[in-house]
C-alpha cells in the first residue's frame, strides 16, 4: 500500500503553545512509529511575535495578511509536487480564519480532502452571534471536507448548525513515552504554565492566592511559568511574603519537570479549547484546578480534577485551599488512568488516519 501523503497547516515552536506543541509531538510520533505508512510535510503558521510582546490590532491584521499570502504560496508549491491524500488544517479562530478561507477554497476547487481541526472553544458563541468572525467560520465549515471538534459541546454545536454529517469528536492526545515518570513525591508547589496574560485568569489567580490566610499558604509556593511582560506583572505589586514566583518561559521539557514536582496545576482561563497543559498534568498524576471552559469539564469529569467557574475568585481560592489542606492524590491517580484509556497518542492518531483516508470529496 502506498504511503499516505499528508500536508499539515499548523504552527511549530517556537514560540511554545498548545497547538505548536501538539504539531511537534505528532510529527515526532509519525516519524518514529508511522514512517512506513505516512509521508508528511508541515506549513508552519506560527506568529513571528508573541502575544506578550504587545501585538496591537494593526500588527495582527498585517501579520494575518502576511500569513495568508505565505501559507497560500507554500501550499501551491506543495500541491505542484502532486496532490496529497489530505491537508490537515488547525485553526484557533480570529484573524486566522481569513487564511483558513483561502486554503479551504483552494482545496475545494481542486477536490482535495481536507480536515479542519478546530482548536478553540468559542464556536457556539460565534455561530450564534453571526458577526464577521462567525460568518467566516461558517463559510469555512461549509468548505471543509471533514471537521474535527475537540470537545463534546463544539461537536454538539456543529451538529445543530447542520455540519453533523462531516463532523467528528476527536480529543487531543499525548505521547506518554515522551513524558517523565510520574513523581510519587510532590512538593508544596502549585504551578501555572501558559501565556501570562489577562485572558488566562492571571489576575484572578494572584488575587485568590493573596486572599488565602498566611497560616495555610506560608509553606506553599505559586509558580507562574510562561512568557510575560514586566509591565503586566508589575501591576500585581507582588511582595516576597506572597510566595509567588514569575518564572518566565522555559523549554518544554523543563516546564514538564516543574509540573511533575508540583502538587497541583492551575489554569483559570477565560477560554480554552482542549489544553495540552491540562493533559500533561493529568498524565503526570498532578492534580488539576481549571476553569469550566472548552473541553476542560469533560477532561476532568469522573473525579479527575477540580473545575471552577471562570473569573470566579472565590471558587478558585476554595480550590487552592483544598489542595493545600486535604489529601488530593486521588485526583491525579484517576486522571492518569483516564489519559491512558482515552487520550494516548496511538489511539487518537488512528482516528486521524481514518479521516485522512477519506476521499469522497464533493
Task: Name each model feature, range by range.
Residues 329-342:
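A short, well-ordered alpha-helix in the C-terminal region of glycosyltransferases
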Residues 270:
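Aromatic "clamp/platform" in nucleotide-sugar-dependent glycosyltransferases that forms part
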Residues 287-290:
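Short hydrophobic beta-strand element within catalytic cores of glycosyltransferases
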Residues 137-179:
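Donor nucleotide-sugar binding/catalytic pocket of nucleotide-sugar-dependent glycosyltransferases
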Amino acid at each position: 500500500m502506498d504511503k499516505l501523503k499528508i500536508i499539515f497547516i499548523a504552527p511549530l515552536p517556537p514560540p511554545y503553545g498548545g497547538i505548536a506543541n501538539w504539531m511537534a509531538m505528532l510529527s515526532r510520533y509519525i516519524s518514529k512509529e508511522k514512517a512506513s505508512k505516512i509521508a508528511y510535510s508541515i506549513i508552519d503558521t506560527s506568529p513571528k511575535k508573541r502575544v506578550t510582546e504587545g501585538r496591537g490590532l494593526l500588527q495582527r491584521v498585517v501579520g494575518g495578511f502576511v500569513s495568508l499570502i505565505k501559507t497560500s504560496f507554500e501550499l501551491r508549491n506543495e500541491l505542484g509536487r502532486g496532490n496529497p491524500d489530505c491537508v490537515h488544517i488547525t485553526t484557533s479562530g480570529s484573524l486566522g480564519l481569513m487564511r483558513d478561507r483561502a486554503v479551504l477554497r483552494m482545496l475545494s476547487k481542486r477536490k482535495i480532502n481536507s480536515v479542519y481541526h478546530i482548536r478553540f472553544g468559542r464556536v457556539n458563541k460565534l455561530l450564534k452571534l453571526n458577526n464577521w468572525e462567525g460568518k467566516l467560520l461558517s463559510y469555512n465549515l461549509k468548505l471543509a471536507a471533514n471537521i474535527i471538534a475537540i470537545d463534546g459541546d463544539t461537536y454538539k454545536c456543529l451538529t445543530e448548525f447542520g455540519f453533523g454529517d462531516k463532523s467528528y469528536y476527536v480529543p487531543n492526545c499525548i505521547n506518554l513515552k515522551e513524558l517523565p515518570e510520574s513523581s510519587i513525591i510532590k512538593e508544596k508547589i502549585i504551578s501555572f504554565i501558559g501565556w501570562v496574560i489577562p485572558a488566562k485568569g492571571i489576575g484572578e489567580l494572584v488575587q485568590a492566592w493573596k486572599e488565602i490566610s498566611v497560616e495555610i499558604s506560608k509553606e506553599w509556593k505559586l509558580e507562574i511559568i510562561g512568557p510575560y511582560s514586566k509591565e503586566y506583572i508589575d501591576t500585581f505589586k507582588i511582595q516576597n511574603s506572597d510566595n509567588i514566583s514569575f518564572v518566565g518561559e522555559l523549554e518544554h521539557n523543563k516546564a514538564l519537570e516543574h509540573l511533575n514536582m508540583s502538587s497541583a496545576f492551575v489554569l483559570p482561563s477565560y477560554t480554552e479549547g482542549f489544553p495540552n497543559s491540562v493533559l500533561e498534568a493529568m498524565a503526570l498524576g498532578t492534580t488539576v484546578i481549571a476553569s469550566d471552559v472548552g473541553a476542560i469539564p469533560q477532561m476532568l469529569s469522573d473525579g479527575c480534577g477540580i473545575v471552577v467557574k471562570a473569573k470566579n475568585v472565590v471558587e478558585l481560592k476554595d480550590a487552592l485551599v483544598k489542595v493545600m489542606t486535604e489529601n488530593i492524590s486521588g485526583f491525579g491517580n484517576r486522571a492518569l488512568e483516564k489519559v491512558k484509556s482515552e487520550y494516548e497518542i496511538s489511539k487518537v492518531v488512528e482516528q486521524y488516519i481514518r479521516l485522512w483516508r477519506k476521499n469522497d470529496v464533493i
